[in-house]
Amino acid sequence: MAEPSAATQSPSVSSSSSGAESSAPGGGSGSPGACPALGTKSCGSSCADSFVSSSSSQPVSLFSTSQVHDLIFWRDVKKTGFVFGTTLIMLLSLAAFSVISVVSYLILALLSVTISFRVYKSVIQAVQKSEEGHPFKAYLDVDITLSSEAFHNYVNAAMVHINRALKLIIRLFLVEDLVDSLKLAVFMWLMTYVGAVFNGITLLILAELLVFSIPIVYEKYKTQIDHYVGIARDQTKSIVEKIQAKLPGIAKKKAE
């Protein structure tokens, strides 16, 4: 008679144990559900640390990568042509005139267009006796205020790049890596010859022409360019390895 009673008690024990397991969902090791077992304080601190680390590793970008990619690859010919033509005219104007003259002429041209259109619409409304109102009212009503959140996002994005640049400058000028510092020295030495031939505006014009032309050429001849770039990279790597092997400090660091 004792066996049936034990048999009747075992389902209750198993159901209670399963109920205890179901009361702690996700209780596996390493799962988020393990937080209740760690306590409220430790769980909150660990969750906060993980949130901070994940958010800090994803900085806000000032520009969308896809938009820049579409712009330099001429996905929208009208938009790219407008940007390319406007910036090229600006740079050519700065090459011929001073910055003050270029800015003044641009403002005068813009004011000439807007004032002429405003006077024209006023005369038309007076002749037709219509009440259309201000011709630029739709644009005047547009909210262009910058929110504090958006401002802080842009500042944070800029600070990421500034801090990265400062670390790189310190690393190069304090010779953390001798080869990288020598590369900078050789590059600056070559730039002295470039600066003797071209001024800053000319270099900007050439840079714009390259930015808006090289991506198209690369997209068209990608296979051939990748082949020759790979050969040049291998040769450069072998030369750098030979130089590093002859430098005692670098060779000792590699051996360690």
Swiss-Prot record:
A Pfam cross-reference name: Reticulon
Ranges within the bilayer without spanning: 88-111, 172-192, 197-217
Region: Interaction with BACE1, residue numbers: 224-226
Sequence segments annotated as region (Disordered): 1-32
Domain of life: Eukaryota
Residue numbers bearing the Phosphoserine modification: 31
PROSITE patterns the UniProt entry points to: RETICULON
Localization in the cell: Endoplasmic reticulum membrane; Golgi apparatus membrane
Biological process (GO), any one: vesicle-mediated transport
Interaction with FADD: region residues: 211-256
Family annotation (PANTHER family): RETICULON-3 (PTHR45799:SF4), RETICULON-LIKE PROTEIN (PTHR45799)
Name of protein: Reticulon-3
Organism encoding this protein: Bos taurus
Lineage of producing organism: Eukaryota, Metazoa, Chordata, Craniata, Vertebrata
